[in-house]
Regions:
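Stable alpha-helical elements in mature extracytoplasmic
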Residues: 4-7, 93-97, 109, 113, ...
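Short, glycine/proline-biased beta-turn/loop segments that scaffold the active-site neighborhood
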Residues: 60-86
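Active-site SXXK
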Residues: 29, 41-69, 238
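Beta-lactamase-like hydrolase cores
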Residues: 1-38
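Structured C-terminal helix/loop/strand segments within mature extracytoplasmic catalytic/sensor domains
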Residues: 1-9, 116, 168-196, 206-209, ...
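Conserved catalytic neighborhood of penicillin-recognizing serine enzymes
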Residues: 76-111, 151
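Mid-domain, small-residue-enriched loop/turn segments at the edges of structured enzyme/sensor domains
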Residues: 15, 112-170
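Short glycine/serine- and small hydrophobic-enriched flexible loop segments
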Residues: 52-60, 103, 115, 160-167, ...
Length: 269
């Protein structure tokens, strides 16, 4: 991992922004951390522990993935997602609400799920997953800030959560697999996987196939992408958080980091 570490350091060193990075090779156990305890505004990455909290409620038989959730006009919020555009009264299974929160970063779906499981249960799930520094207080797209604070994440914490998920230890082995399967369907692919060979092309020059279970987060000046890379029998957890950087440049750096991770995993296959 030393070569990968060196390449990633060279990518972020010229940046005027702040970067929090954790890369963990789950096959070798090697890990590299950079500003791993630094707190960043969570943006939509907070949706990953929210998903875990919902699966925890399902595991405890408090909810079922087949439960129908009815949409109410007063619950609609703006920003990412399609639920805000659907007819009020439309009902969708809980599994679809979770999926939309993850693969389209649907904010209305997120707030519905927060209401279902409760803030305290989400906080407890984060604690149980080893998220020592991160905080969760707020639903999304609210006009009034919470006086207790904002949703924040540290790269170390997100890395811990994803590592548990990748090893089948987040909530349960079955829940971990279901969460990974959802994240693999991600529609927002413009950061870590941007420069990877197209999974739909037959002209990849013999490069190994890859999968990425990821979740992005973005507001102006803040851009994150976190996930689990799968190449052959290799698995690597990547948490890359950034703030106070030009949006175009941060996306460019993230995509190059994703490419370097892929190249590293290809050499090890």
């Amino acid at each position: 991992m030393e070569e990968l570490r060196s390449k990633v350091q060279k990518l972020v060193k010229p940046s005027k922004g702040t970067w929090g990075i954790v890369l963990e090779d789950l096959n070798t156990g090697e890990k590299w951390e950079h500003n791993e305890q630094e707190l960043f505004y969570a943006a939509s990455v907070i949706k990953v522990p929210i998903m875990a909290a919902v699966f925890q409620a399902v595991e405890r038989k408090q909810l079922s993935l087949s439960d129908l959730i009815s949409l109410k006009k007063e619950e609609y919020v703006g920003g990412s997602g399609v639920l805000q555009h659907l007819t009020p009264g439309t009902s969708l299974p809980l599994s679809d609400i979770i999926l939309l929160m993850i693969i389209q970063s649907d904010n209305t779906a997120t707030n519905l799920l927060i209401d279902l499981v409760g803030v305290e249960n989400i906080q407890q799930t984060m604690k149980d997953a080893g998220m020592e520094y991160s905080t969760f207080y707020n639903k999304l797209m609210l006009s009034e800030p919470n006086p207790l604070g904002s949703n924040s994440i540290a790269a170390k914490d997100v890395g811990n959560l994803l590592s548990k998920m990748a090893q089948g230890q987040l909530v349960s082995e079955q829940a971990s697999k279901q969460m990974i399967d959802m994240m693999k369907k991600q529609q927002v692919r413009d950061c870590l996987p941007e420069k990877l060979p197209s999974p739909y092309s037959n002209f990849n020059n013999g490069m190994p196939a890859w999968e990425l279970a990821n979740k992005t987060g973005w507001i102006p000046g803040t851009r994150h992408d976190v996930g689990i890379f799968f190449v052959g029998n290799r698995k690597l957890v990547a948490t890359v958080l950034s703030e106070k950087e030009d949006d175009v440049l941060s996306k460019r750096i993230l995509s190059q980091i994703g490419y370097e991770i892929y190249q590293y995993l290809c050499k090890e296959v």
